[in-house]
């Protein structure tokens, strides 16, 4: 890679890289169970960190990352791409303005018909082994939809979680053996928050179904479907369904309201925050609660009952991989 892109400096030891005093920030783009040790080492070395999703391979490790961020006074940004779509921006403005009224239920839906990494033909085998990934469909894709809803709702604290995970459909036996496939391809859950708010979670890497309807938000005055974005309400006692001109919104933001563009893409937002042009969105906090929900579904499935968020916090353990010669 260094030769291909003419990168002059290359390292075999991450600690040596982090000793450089001319580096302000690093990007951690590794397998999930490597996120925590490298991120923590970078934060302790005085660097700001941009980390891939999910935050870590377990809630325990994600929390350690968050604590280190606070301790070191550095920025930690998690790649939560769905926070920066125009759909999300429009929905956020409507929710903050009270257009939906009291929000009481949301649905987080992610769908692939036959899209399991490696066994269905793309991606590396580490995606489907918990020793490297920590989880399956929930960790890989569910993180986007759950975090999007948490952001829109103001990142409420989960109270109770119930759910089940599944691996039911056939796959290539040779690739199953090579990858040691041991993660879920489908997950379903229900999350309770304060004041009666609930979240339904459905996430599929592989399912015999032609489509899911996508994520949605239900309020006392109106409801939103998020992709494609539509608004549903009663107007003068008549049912109304409305769509949005996203292309016009994109054009107007890029020409008239150019300052909004720092919130339209994760890395652009990160760079702007590093340059002091905008405050960083609380992606670390949102990703931490997302991880709590995901691990809660796993724990609930193992115990076949609803669990509290406190149980998840107390039982979560580190599954970080050992990295030789890494100091943190």
Where do the PLM segments sit?
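Hydrophobic residues in well-ordered beta-strands that form the structural core
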Residues: 11, 51, 76-78, 201, ...
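Conserved SAM-binding loop
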Residues: 1-2
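C-terminal capping/lid region of NAD(P)-dependent oxidoreductase domains
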Residues: 74-75, 101-105, 299-328
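Beta-loop-alpha module in the N-terminal Rossmann-like domain of NAD(P)-dependent dehydrogenases
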Residues: 5-68
